[in-house]
């Protein structure tokens, strides 16, 4: 067993898009945050497990809100004065024969501390589960990604449904410093949205070569 704890601070300035696009507001203030987490980790043989409690408090969180002072009637970027993310992450892995299993679950409460409402476009639940193995010189695997529903607006009036995606991947070393990579994301060509009216990628195939000099 191993226990760890950490605290930290962060700062993020608004981008040019946040300030000067159709949805931008030139007077946006930068974000600042304070983060704290406590974790407990276990490793034994072919198994690992961890549980991490976290809390992140953000001042002037930059997020997309309703109609405001920008040029768009659809909505504008705005600062949320006081926001908080807190929750727990469970992660683990286990080898069964030649198969490596792994997964993680995030349970969080993203909320506006002034209104008590859920932060826009942030889901409360996320999970990833996968498995991979060696087959004929290749590392091949599959993973499932799932997310709970989220609200598109700060008023929590427009709901974006949850989704589940299946991805496949494979890789093999073709030379000392080169690895051939292939991946299919969103195998079932699932339609889903992270922001209303904005499309996400359908089934996507990637092929590439990774160079890692040794």
Predicted stretch roles:
Residues 14-22, 29, 63-74, 106-112, ...:
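Flexible, solvent-exposed coil segments and beta strand-coil junctions
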Residues 10, 115-119, 155, 160, ...:
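Solvent-exposed loop/turn segments connecting transmembrane beta-strands
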Residues 5, 26, 36-38, 78, ...:
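Membrane-embedded beta-strands of outer-membrane beta-barrel proteins
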Residues 147, 158-165:
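Outer-membrane beta-barrel transmembrane domain signature
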Residues 57-59, 146-153, 168-214:
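C-terminal beta-signal and adjacent terminal beta-strands/loops
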Residues 48-49, 54-58, 75-153, 173, ...:
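Gram-negative outer-membrane beta-barrel transporters
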Residues 9-59, 66-96, 120-124, 159-161:
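Outer-membrane beta-barrel signature, preferentially recognizing the C-terminal barrel domain
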């Amino acid at each position: 067993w191993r226990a760890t704890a950490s605290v930290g601070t962060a700062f993020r300035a608004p981008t040019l898009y946040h300030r000067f696009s159709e949805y931008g507001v030139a007077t946006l203030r930068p974000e600042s945050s304070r983060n704290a987490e406590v974790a407990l980790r276990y490793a034994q043989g072919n198994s690992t497990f961890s549980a991490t409690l976290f809390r992140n408090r953000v001042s002037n969180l930059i997020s997309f809100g309703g109609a405001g002072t920008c040029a768009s009637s659809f909505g504008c970027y705005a600062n949320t004065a006081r926001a908080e993310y807190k929750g727990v992450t469970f992660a683990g892995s286990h080898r069964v024969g030649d198969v490596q299993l792994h997964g993680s679950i995030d349970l969080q409460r993203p909320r506006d501390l002034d209104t008590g409402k859920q932060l826009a476009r942030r889901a409360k639940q996320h999970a990833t589960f996968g498995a991979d193995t060696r087959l004929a010189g290749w590392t091949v695997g599959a993973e499932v990604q799932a997310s709970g529903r989220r609200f598109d607006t700060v008023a929590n009036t427009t709901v974006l449904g949850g989704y589940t995606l299946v991805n496949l991947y494979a890789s093999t070393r073709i030379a000392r410093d080169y690895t051939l990579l292939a991946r299919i994301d969103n195998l079932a060509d699932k339609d889903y949205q992270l922001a209303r009216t904005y499309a996400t990628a359908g089934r996507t195939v990637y092929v590439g070569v990774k160079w890692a000099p040794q």
